[in-house]
């Protein structure tokens, strides 16, 4: 694919175009996707790991992953932000939210139809508070019902966040197989 090759010559090393296809002039990748998946990774151990400093958030206090997993289930469904947000609609659907741990890495994986500004980082910050015992898993329902940004946990730092993929709606004239 000549276009992918040309783009990859000019993009930074952490961004790769794996494929391309022709689309109608009015097609917009931001607004015509059906699902996005993000992962937020937390390095949960006593000491930092320099090799993971760019793709994980280092958090040295112990976190209860089981509590975080229980809380994550409450996030599935519709989520909202403050009423005065500067977007057309504040309603977003979370299809799946999970928390797993492998070695010293805790991964929060969130799939939804779209995300508000900092939404995944706010979810991560809130789940970190759950894991640290400041919030009980069951309180997530109250936080969502409040529809108030101040009720949720802090915004977690950006360097733990990675977009894992985008799924596009089926278009009869567009081949989106393998496009991320």
Predicted stretch roles:
Residues 1-180:
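Structured-RNA-binding interfaces characteristic of tRNA pseudouridine synthases
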């Amino acid at each position: 694919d000549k276009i992918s090759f040309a783009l990859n010559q000019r993009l930074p090393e952490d961004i790769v175009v794996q494929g391309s296809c022709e689309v109608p002039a009015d097609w917009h990748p931001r607004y015509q996707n059906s699902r996005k998946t993000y992962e937020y990774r937390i390095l949960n151990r006593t000491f930092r790991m320099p090799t993971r400093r760019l793709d994980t958030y280092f958090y040295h206090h112990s976190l209860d992953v089981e509590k975080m997993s229980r809380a994550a289930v409450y996030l599935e469904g519709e989520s909202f932000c403050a009423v005065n947000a500067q977007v057309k609609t504040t309603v977003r659907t979370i299809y799946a939210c999970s928390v797993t741990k492998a070695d010293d890495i805790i991964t929060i994986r969130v799939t939804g139809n779209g995300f508000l500004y900092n939404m995944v980082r706010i979810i991560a910050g809130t789940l970190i508070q759950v894991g640290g015992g400041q919030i009980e898993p069951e309180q997530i329902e109250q936080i969502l019902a409040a529809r108030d940004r101040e009720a949720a946990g802090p915004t977690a730092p950006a360097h733990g966040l990675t977009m894992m993929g985008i799924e596009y709606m089926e278009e009869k004239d567009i081949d989106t197989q393998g496009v991320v």
